């Protein structure tokens, strides 16, 4: 029984001694806190002399670029604010308190520099969570609260969606001037060690710079962090630019459709409606500003003018296609030479047989010769035969009438075919013309933006 009893005492004695150790640490911290904050006034600057300046070492660490709102010109970020300063009232000798070199206390319990974001857009200028601070035995106070900011940012959407934005965040003390609180930049570069990538934007550069704002005799220091952002254009390229390019080349194919088809105007009108829908989509994205026109807006405007002209040209071509000698004057000689002979060869079209001639002139000589022969024959025929000749002459007149009618119909048919061929030539001309204009316009509009976007990689 004795060994078992001794074993129980030993087991029970171990946690008792450990608890005593824990209690001593807690008691030391409790005594230290009572010592530090006895008579501590958090509303008073912790300096030895009234003319001393508190140097606040300030740094920024970005954890996430949440959103870049071009419409409202806002940038939303999640950051950590690194702040470090010396509080002369919070010093102690670690040997007097069980070797405690640092403690963590609520930030509401001690003096804090009132550093805020000046370009705040949602009214929450402090924006940070009141986390605990680390107080060291030499009086150094380290506070790194997380914060979520919505800052104003002037957007330049000239090269949208291949644009770059330069947004800034300016931090400074709200009430203290430079003689009371001075800001010192910890690191020129923003800490991006734990940065969570954004799917639409990438940060090319993020640097801080100290500045001073003069207000009379007082100087107010501030630190400005500039973020150079570049948009990743893959989404807009696939779902906005490529469809617009397709619609522009679809407009060119309007001139490849035969004029007999009634779908030429329907296709052009459908393309125009589609472009209007794309324009409404872009209007929801970009800010409503009259200073600059975005690149994609210029391109859509160019294509809409392009399609409108194609509709006008198509109406004219269809009008030419349905011309005939019964509704219009005969084709002018220069039109025949240009559109039936010269242009088809230049456009690599099949030769058109020019059968466009006047039927009255072709049959005038045979008719005259027939009447002369008839007169000669009438002198040599008897009276009985004259009756037969008269009958035959009436039959010949009827045949000539039918022949003239058939030739006239054939003549009208040839005129119609000639005008249709002219319409085909016009279609081919405008096909090549619109294709060249479409390709050239697309290259001229997008080349500067692509150069700038690719240059940012170097």
From Swiss-Prot:
Pfam families with a match to the protein in the record: Neur_chan_LBD, Neur_chan_memb
Signal sequence interval, chain numbering: 1-21
Name where it's found.
Answer: Synaptic cell membrane; Cell membrane
Q: Which reaction does it catalyse?
A: Ca(2+)(in) = Ca(2+)(out); K(+)(in) = K(+)(out); Na(+)(in) = Na(+)(out)
Q: What does this protein do?
A: Component of neuronal acetylcholine receptors (nAChRs) that function as pentameric, ligand-gated cation channels with high calcium permeability among other activities. nAChRs are excitatory neurotrasnmitter receptors formed by a collection of nAChR subunits known to mediate synaptic transmission in the nervous system and the neuromuscular junction. Each nAchR subunit confers differential attributes to channel properties, including activation, deactivation and desensitization kinetics, pH sensitivity, cation permeability, and binding to allosteric modulators.
Entry keyword annotation includes Disulfide bond: yes
The record places the following residue ranges in the Cytoplasmic compartment, namely 321-428
Q: Which organism is it from?
A: Homo sapiens (Human)
Tell me its family. Answer: Belongs to the ligand-gated ion channel (TC 1.A.9) family. Acetylcholine receptor (TC 1.A.9.1) subfamily. Beta-3/CHRNB3 sub-subfamily.
Q: What does UniProt list under activity regulation?
A: Activated by a myriad of ligands such as acetylcholine, cytisine, nicotine, choline and epibatidine.
Tell me which residues are glycosylated: 51, 138, 166
Name the UniProt record assigns to this protein: Neuronal acetylcholine receptor subunit beta-3
One MF annotation (Gene Ontology) recorded for this entry? acetylcholine-gated monoatomic cation-selective channel activity
Paired cysteines (S-S) = 153-167
Effect annotated for changing residue 273 to L/T: Increases potency of agonists
List residues traversing the bilayer. 238-258, 267-287, 300-320, 429-449
Lineage of this protein's species?
Eukaryota, Metazoa, Chordata, Craniata, Vertebrata
Which GO terms of the cellular component aspect does the record hold?
acetylcholine-gated channel complex; cation channel complex; dopaminergic synapse; membrane; neuron projection; neurotransmitter receptor complex; plasma membrane; postsynaptic membrane
Matching entries from InterPro entries are given as: Neur_chan_lig-bd, Neur_chan_lig-bd_sf, Neur_channel, Neuro-gated_channel_TM_sf, Neuro_actylchol_rec, Neurotrans-gated_channel_TM, Neurotransmitter_ion_chnl_CS, Nicotinic_acetylcholine_rcpt
